[in-house]
């Protein structure tokens, strides 16, 4: 893991790094030392590790004592994009423009990314937990939309993850992995989501095998998640990662 920059403000330290070809950012409380809970933060489709919502959420968590890490998903942000991914995203945009339901199209894109994303996250988790200011503490995952689509296969495969905040995605292509998830989950649904049909979101929630799972449903479209849900997710992680 090679760090390229470090800044601190408002009690939070932000460090940019690369691990092999994976670019990422680590947020920790300023002057942090010793083991603490770690949250893996997955960004949405077409976004990147320093999208405004990702940074705001990460800083909120870090200000309360958590370590938080975000990486660019395959073919996003500072990572190279291949021709196949370009073809898939072009088909997705064309399908949505033609009025097709995006569920199956989005699932195809996530499937193309998921196997590499899982390997990337597992490598990042191992590397970050070797740092003195993070250590081998409890781990959570937070991801909406594509962050959920890539997070579900990760959580199903990675026993170090003990709790997750997910949502804004349907069940297409995810039922089998969701059925392997037994950790506590907080799941968000936007009731008027124009990208993900409500019944598909609810079907994904239902497919999760977690004995403890809660559904947070709010009115509004895909990007209209109320800001108070960040605080709610913080309390969820504080309960399960303390």
Can you say where each PLM-predicted feature lies in the sequence?
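Primarily recognizes the serine-hydrolase "nucleophile elbow" in alpha/beta-hydrolase
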Residues: 116-180
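N-terminal cap/lid segment of alpha/beta-hydrolase-fold proteins
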Residues: 1-34
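Acidic catalytic loop of the alpha/beta-hydrolase fold
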Residues: 191-196, 223-224
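Catalytic histidine neighborhood in serine/cysteine hydrolases
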Residues: 202, 206-223
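Short beta-strand/loop motif that positions the catalytic acidic residue
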Residues: 181, 187-189, 193
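Serine-hydrolase catalytic machinery in alpha/beta-hydrolase-like enzymes
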Residues: 44-130
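Short alpha-helix in the alpha/beta-hydrolase fold that links the catalytic acid
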Residues: 54-55, 183, 197-206
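Short beta-strand element of the alpha/beta-hydrolase
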Residues: 34-44
């Amino acid at each position: 893991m090679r760090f390229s920059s470090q800044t601190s403000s408002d009690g939070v330290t932000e460090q940019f790094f690369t691990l092999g070809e994976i670019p990422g950012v680590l947020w920790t409380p300023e002057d942090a030392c010793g083991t603490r809970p770690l949250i893996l933060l997955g960004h949405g489709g077409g976004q990147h590790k320093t999208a405004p919502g990702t940074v705001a959420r990460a800083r909120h968590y870090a200000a309360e004592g958590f370590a938080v890490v975000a990486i660019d998903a395959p073919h996003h942000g500072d990572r190279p994009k291949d021709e196949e991914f370009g073809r898939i995203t072009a088909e997705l945009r064309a399908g949505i423009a033609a009025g097709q339901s995006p569920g199956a199209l989005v699932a195809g894109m996530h499937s193309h990314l998921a196997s590499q994303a899982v390997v990337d996250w597992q490598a990042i988790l191992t590397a970050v937990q070797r740092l003195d200011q993070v250590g081998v503490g409890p781990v959570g995952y937070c991801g909406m939309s594509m962050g959920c689509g890539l997070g579900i296969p990760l959580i199903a495969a990675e026993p170090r993850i003990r709790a997750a905040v997910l949502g804004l995605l349907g069940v297409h292509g995810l039922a089998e992995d969701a059925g392997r998830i037994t950790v506590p989950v907080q799941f968000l649904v936007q009731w008027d989501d124009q990208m993900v049909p409500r019944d598909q979101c609810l079907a994904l929630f239902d497919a999760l095998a977690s004995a403890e799972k809660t559904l947070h449903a709010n009115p509004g479209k895909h990007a209209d998640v109320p800001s108070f849900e960040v605080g709610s997710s913080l309390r969820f992680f504080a309960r399960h990662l303390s």
